[in-house]
Amino acid sequence: MNQVVLYSMKGCPWCDMMKDALKQANIEFRDRDIDKYKKEYDMFVEATGNEYVPAFMLMKLEGETIKDVRLLAPERDYDDIHEAIEKVKNYL
């Protein structure tokens, strides 16, 4: 089983565009508001050096065991959002 986690925040137009693009691509994802999931997001920032949203954590799971994790922090532009969607599709 694979899992897509999207880190986002309220009032972020890029986050809204990314959510819409994921929905249009029929990609299931867990939306993590960085204000509610601060500890989790802080670990993401520490691992990537990226403090901007939207950002992804992609995980391959076998049962409860994480077999692979990819971190993805696309630039905030229209083309990169769609490129990020393609990377997510290819990972899944």
Segments the model singles out, each with a brief description of its role:
Residues 33-52, 62, 85-91:
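Thioredoxin-like thiol-disulfide oxidoreductase module
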Residues 1-30:
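Local sequence-structure signature of Cys/Sec-based thiol-disulfide redox active-site neighborhoods
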Residues 60-92:
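Non-catalytic, surface beta->alpha helical segment in thiol-disulfide oxidoreductase systems
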Residues 11, 34-37, 74-77:
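Short beta->alpha junction loops/turns
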Residues 45-53, 69-76:
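Thiol/disulfide oxidoreductase modules built on the thioredoxin-like
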Residues 10, 32, 44, 69:
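Conserved short-loop catalytic and cofactor-binding motifs
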Residues 54-58:
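Cytosolic beta-strand hydrophobic patch enriched in CBS
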